[in-house]
């Protein structure tokens, strides 16, 4: 893997990649918003905000692409103040004061409004940058991970709300001028925990609370189409649910035994189940088990092929949450479960079999497929403080179907503690997969090579230099934003 130099960033926003993949934004301690071209990594846009405000910033969010219009606005926000900056119209900016009602979260709508979540009340403020006005969406459910769902192709949003002791779905037509409530329907749920549109926009899945194993499927018109309950006895419900990229499968993650139920999306009947268990062995030629090994004296970490899964994991709890990620063409899926938090399971969805198991030394905190290459996945693990591996050895793990073995890659910078990773969208300018790796106060861009012998990065190349940044700031126009 080839690494670029280090570029300045701040915790907890780190670096933010635009949806179009053209820009990488980060913050500096001096109050600068630094925006680089993701291809050349040259500094193209610089905004100067109040340095004290920058130290409080917790959100750095690019506006999504609106049709043919590429993303050109970015939201920089703390819990009590929001700025919107524009890299095309440098003299434009917007600020929203929220100190009377601090934010618990913030996001963009598909039509370009800001959704501001209140810390004090169950409401969302929809803020229009065009009209410079905000309006409230009341009775929004709190403490729910998927409380709203944006339709993938039409300009409307579904909100999960609760009032008078009942769950409701609210369908809003969204535009740059206003959000109009089109329809409201009462749900049969006791306490719904999430909603999610299918990729084709025809179906809306509504998940019941974890004590009841049921999922309701609504048509886009708001009519209840199907109610799925497993045929076998399940003492508790589902911890999560996910659609595959093209909508072929709806996956339900059982909280009872960490089994994943895959439903086909014509009749919403069960197709097959993915079982997380320790009985698999690699005696089958199609099955591969790799375990991470550490060599302290050589300061290396590698994967070794093993005959069977370890059985010395801590005794799992009765209930286990699971997560699933599909690759971009729906041929493979990666899963983890809190039952065995050190293990990543890779499933071949074409023959409905387990293909590969990766056993890590530490708990997996993040895993994601490459957005354009269907056989490549990255894994990030939590490094324990009591680990004997030197502090410079913070690693990322990669698996690709075309490789002979999985790979362990360490950032060649002493003390670089990986906090966040993000794939770059495939680009016509680069045939190699590209990933942004963020540390606590800097980030680097890494390029994956097929042959590890072709990769070479000097440690001196990854030393962050304030002098280099100062020179870049001198040659790049800085736009000062009033505080």
Swiss-Prot record:
Superkingdom assignment: Eukaryota
Listed InterPro entries: Centrosome-WD_assoc, WD40/YVTN_repeat-like_dom_sf, WD40_repeat_dom_sf, WD40_rpt
Chain positions of WD repeats: 96-137
GO biological process, one term: mitotic sister chromatid segregation
GO cellular component: cytosol; microtubule organizing center; mitotic spindle; mitotic spindle pole body; MWP complex; nucleus
Key words of the record: WD repeat
Keyword flag Ubl conjugation: no
Pfam family, one: WD40
Protein name: Uncharacterized WD repeat-containing protein C32H8.09
